[in-house]
Every structure is written in C-alpha cells, then in structure tokens.
Amino acid sequence: MAQHSHETGGGQGFPLLTDLVSKDSAPLFVENLLRGEKPRAEWMCGVEFELFGYDRARSFERIDAEQVQRVLAGFAPSSNDIVHEGGAVVEVNDGQMNRLTVEPGGQVEFSGAPQRRLADVERELRRYLARLREVAESNRLTFLAVGFDPLRTIEEQRWFPKMRYEVMRPYLAARGRRAWDMMCRTCAVQSNLDYGPPADLAKKFLVGNRLAPVVTAIFANSPFEGGRPSGYKSTRAAAWLDTDAARAGLAPPALRDDFAPEDYVAYALDVPMIFVQRGGRYLGAVAGVRFREFLERGRGGLRPVFGDWADHLTTIFTDARLKQHVELRSADGNDLETSLALQALWKGLLYDPAALDEALRLAPRLKGADALVLRERVARDGLAAAHEIGRAHV
C-alpha cells in the first residue's frame, strides 16, 4: 500500500533512487510497477482520510501552519517519530505504522497502514479520530469531514510551508482556474488496494477509472462553498474539472479495452513534470517538460535518476492511478461510517473475481469527450446525473 518503501526501487538487484536512467528505461519502469504483484492471500487494503481543521477561537478560520504542526506532534510517541522539513513538522508516525501528513492548505491526512481486514481499518480509524478529538479539544479546534471547504474563500486560505507545495503552487495555477481550490479547499477519502498478475492489475485500473464518476456521485459530500450552496453536489469534483487536464480526471489509458501496464508507463512518460529533488530541495527547472524528454536530454544540467520517476508518479492525479498498488481517488471526504462504506465497496468490487469481471462489463465505456461530460454532470447533479448511454446511479 502507500506505506511500502520498495515502491521507489532499491530492492536487491534493482536500481537505487539515485541511479541514472535514460530514454531506454521504460521497461525498467514497467518492471518496477509489476513488482507490486502479490498473491491473493497477501492482498491488503489501506485508507487515506483527509480532514479540514478550523479554529473555534477565531470564528472558524482554517487552522494555520503552527496549529497544524501542534496537531501532528500530538500523535508522535517520541521525537524520533516526527519528520521535519525546514524546521516545520511535516509528517508524524503514530507508533502503529500509520502516518499523518499535511496537504497544501493545512488539511490533515491520515494514511493508514495496510490491513488484512476492513475491521482493522475501522479500528485504526476510530483510534485516530478518538485521539484527534483529544488534541483538537485541547487546542480549541474543530475538524470537518467534507469534500470541499464550505466556509472559507480561496483568499482566506493558509498555505502550509512545504517545499513540494511551493513548487507546485505556481505551476498548477497556470494550468487550471481552480487548481488552488483543489490544493487548499478539497478533502478526499482514498482507497488503496493490491493487485495480482498484469491482467488483474489492468482490470482494477480500468474499473477504478471507469466507475469513478459513479463513486463520485454516490459519495458526493460537498454542496457548499463560501457559506452558501455552490450549485454542485460535489464542489470538490467541480474543482478537479478545472485543474491541469494533463494529469487529472479519467486516465486516458483507461479508455483502452486492451490496456496493459506498459500503457500506463507510456502515458506517464508524456505527462509534464513539475519538479525533481536534489540535495533535499525541490527544483522546478524541469517544470512543463515531459518525462520522456527529460530522459532523452536532461534539463538545466540535471540528469534523470530513478527517484525522479517515483516523484513524477506522485504528481499524476487521475481518478485511479498506479504505483505498486491501485489508488482509488474519486470520493469526497466523508465521515467515518461513510468512508468505511467506500472501502467496503471498492474492496468488494476489486477483490472478488466475479464482481470485478461484472463491474468491468457494466462500467461505462466512454470516449474522452463523453467522459468529461459525465464528470461535469456528476459534479453538478450527483446521482441524478444523466448521460445518453445511461444514468450514473446504481
């Protein structure tokens, strides 16, 4: 799941993050993807759960960077479990193999350790939320589980001081009118699931993307913006519609019935880069350069290394994406019970072979333009969204 360190290579006989790569490295990237294959008996499930924090003492302003860091530090068993960047607390390990991190607008994200059973996912989420209530109460804070900030405008947002976001902020702003809304004013619940052989990986990726509008509709939970109705069932989904189409929405390879892992690598190679890391710094010298071009010619004196590929994959924001697991990213932030229902839905569809085959058969097979129309209608109307080939409801 998201916690697996080997996703970025470095295993026995496999490149280190610092190893150079070239225009001939596409097979290596495919091999790295396929290293996520696991036997069915070892399949696990993971959850990523985001929340907005508000300051009760300041008329429910969004919490600032100092408050976010206090919240994170409240989960650390010791100072050794705290990750700093430039003096700021940016990540905490809670002693149970779970991580807490921060999104660009100070949203707090719980990344759960992979679990065999949904009951164990529930146990860890309940433990996290119980502790969060204690930390919030001691700091006079309130946390809200919705898909879009219902109260504060983009001008009122507080940006968290993280180097990655400082590079992403201007890049994405130039490529989508609502990119900053996406970064600061959205929260999601994400499901992370394992896969078996390449054919199983392909089915899960296709279903995850093709059913994304249906899942968005079922779990739509963001009808407000600026303290009033926004006109959307999922304002979060609406924000994503105007955020860098080169890396968001329905993954183009999912339009292919003959999809194979090589197609995902080929797609990712043509997605423009945002940054690379060198010496603990995020460098935007590669911004806008397709990864394929970076492999061929480098950029600004920089030569591509294997770790650049791993970083690049984290900047692809499609409804379902691949690392060494499948990430399912189409649902609004929701409360505990609804978030657990989401996990059960995805696990039931993707881990039962008969259900997976039937889901693939029933999932909409849309052309690119039709898929965009469906996403727009789902954002506005949720389960009532109509499309000429059917309705986005179950």
Regions found by a protein language model. Give the residues of each.
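Short, compositionally biased segments
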Residues: E388-G390
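Conserved small/polar residues in nucleotide/adenosyl-binding loops
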Residues: A392-V394
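Structured core elements
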Residues: E50-F52, Q190-N192, E327-R329
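Solvent-exposed residues in well-ordered beta-strands and their adjoining turns
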Residues: Y54-R56, A113, D194-G196, A331, ...
